[in-house]
Amino acid sequence: MTSSQHADNSFYLYGSPVSFYTVKVRSYLHYKGIPFVEVRATNKIFKEFIEPATDGWRVIPVLKTPQGHCIQDSRIILDELESAYTDRSITPPGLKQQVVSSLFELLGDEWLVFPAMHYRWNFKKHNLKYILNAFGQSRSPHWPKAVRFLGGIMPALMFANVPRFILGINKKILQH
């Protein structure tokens, strides 16, 4: 599906079922009762819609509004929607609660990603089949099921060493 095929007045969430931040935005949209269409970020969608909408970046999630605006970054998406949909706010009313809420979000968005990525990527014996199938399903959903996992190889290779790089993990550290 390309952006020119969006004839109605819906929100479109471009992302992946295995993206933590896509899940965050999807959960918010469900919580608020905001109708949306979820579009899997396949290679074609990245090339035809996401990259042009984000100045060449291959990032998800991206939310396309009914007015045709594209918003990237889960926090910015939620902030924009919160200002437009004020019922059932996710922002607590009191200042102390807002501080605690912001700290929880910071913890979840910035710090819990490290152990999540560690357990996703550093246990290949247990996770590799799932990873290849999940990325293959996202990137190459129209391929025959028997070979769809092959579509997951490139994204898996791209992400595989990111957790180690960010955490400063190397072979010497792992041997101790």
Question: PLM features: residue spans?
Answer:
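GST-like domain detector, emphasizing the conserved glutathione-binding G-site
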Residues: 2-144
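A conserved mid-domain beta-alpha-beta active-site/ligand-binding segment of alpha/beta enzyme cores
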Residues: 145-164, 168
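Loop-centered beta-sheet repeat module
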Residues: 166-176
